[in-house]
Amino acid sequence: MKLLNEILGTKYPIIQGGMANIATGEFAAACSNAGALGIIGAGGMNADTLRENIRRCKQLTDKPFGVNIMLMHPQADEFAQIVVEEGVQVVTTGAGNPGKYVPMWKAAGIKVIPVVAAAVLAKHLEKLGIDAVIAEGTESGGHVGEMATMALVPQVVDAVDLPVIAAGGIADGRQLAAALALGACGVQVGTCLLVSEECPIHENYKAALLLSLIHISEPTRLDVI
């Protein structure tokens, strides 16, 4: 099994999560320069802002970086075209099926890596010709399912013949090692990067996170009754 850094051309087998309203071009570039795969979070942007952030990231790093597209975004179609036009190397997706974009992205040489919260979804997406999946457990700060990372990752590893990236509650080398032991090729991290110097959130936000000894992350959820 190849490690994620071998697949992506990065120094470390780590992807920075594409956190909406946080993961700017500057932040993604800083993460890429540090050895991870920086990801621009398109979720809080419009088409023009996304293009500007991609170009800014290119100015700040010569390392690989990617874009995260939330497929429920009203400008998802435009985002899908912009990443092709701007020569983005990796796209991660969430909140929808990327199927209609995969042929265009693959023709442009883009690696396509959807986020999944269940093995059955990973199996379905594998048929589309994607490059890898991010198995994101409920510990994640993002929009996820109900299964914990420790249980989800080996299920997805067993279900698909694709590289699997673990996400959800991963913050240090011990958890990276655990993810590799579960069969993942690397990890995606988000919440733990919020307190980095390069992260653009307010210093009070960072201080609150560092003082939170019980709940370091609070998942974002939408309950349908």
Residue positions per predicted region:
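Generic alpha-helical structural context detector
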Residues: 29, 207-211, 221
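C-terminal helical cap(s) of enzyme catalytic domains, especially alpha/beta-barrels
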Residues: 53-56, 196-212
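Catalytic cores of alpha/beta
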Residues: 120-128, 151-152, 165-166, 170-187
